[in-house]
Amino acid sequence: MRVFLTGATGFLGSSLAAELLRRGHNVRALVRPGSRSRVPPGCDIVHGDALRAETYVDKVAPADTFVHLVGVSHPSPSKAEEFRKIDLVSAREAVNAAKPAGVDHFVYLSVARPAPMMKAYQAVRAEGEAMVIASGIPATFVRPWYVLGPGRSWPRMLQPFYAVARLFPATRAGANRLALVTLEQMTQTLAWAVENRPEQLQIFEPPQIKVGGRLPARSEREAASA
């Protein structure tokens, strides 16, 4: 399968690129000049700006799947303005590049919601999802809350609180929806999504991510009503 990947130099994107290559897929990675060294060997390199579709729109085809992972690193409530300038703009430009290229599957990294914090981040990612849906391209939304990985392990201290929350019916659903996931789980889920295009839309949240996407994906209606 031919995959066009943005965010390939990030900790998640580089892991996914390596896994897709291991599975025998062709990966074309969008990178800024000077960032090539952070992309796994074997990727086809495309130089461009994720915030300007015109810099790479003619280099997307012939891709079957477009995977968009660009976003502000280490999201926090103080980065609301950055979310709109980077996460939202890059999502809009990705859709603008994917549509004319004729890709038949758009995989979008979103965020679990609703949640009691990071409202601006949730809002921007919801807007990104809406743009993907409006494009008409069959899509997969992957919605983690927090991804554990190199330099991202401090939330493990919250695991006892999650365990307690799962004991009570009133808090069980929220604890599952906002569960912590690992880099390996995210990598496997995204790779599974690439290889399993939906007819219209599928959504993976932490319960599905924890098993690498092997639980049935949820529809938009099911996710909204949970």
Regions found by a protein language model. Name each.
Residues 1-23:
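N-terminal Rossmann NAD(P)H-binding glycine-rich loop of SDR-like oxidoreductase domains
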Residues 35-93, 97-100:
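NAD(P)H-binding glycine-rich loop region in Rossmannoid oxidoreductase-like domains
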Residues 84-88, 118-127, 176-181:
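Short-chain dehydrogenase/reductase
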Residues 86, 90-93, 156, 177-192:
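Substrate-positioning beta->alpha
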Residues 130-153:
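Conserved beta-loop-beta element that borders a ligand/cofactor-binding pocket
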Residues 150-173:
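NAD(P)-dependent short-chain dehydrogenase/reductase
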Residues 164-167, 180-221, 226:
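Alpha-helical substrate-binding/gating segment
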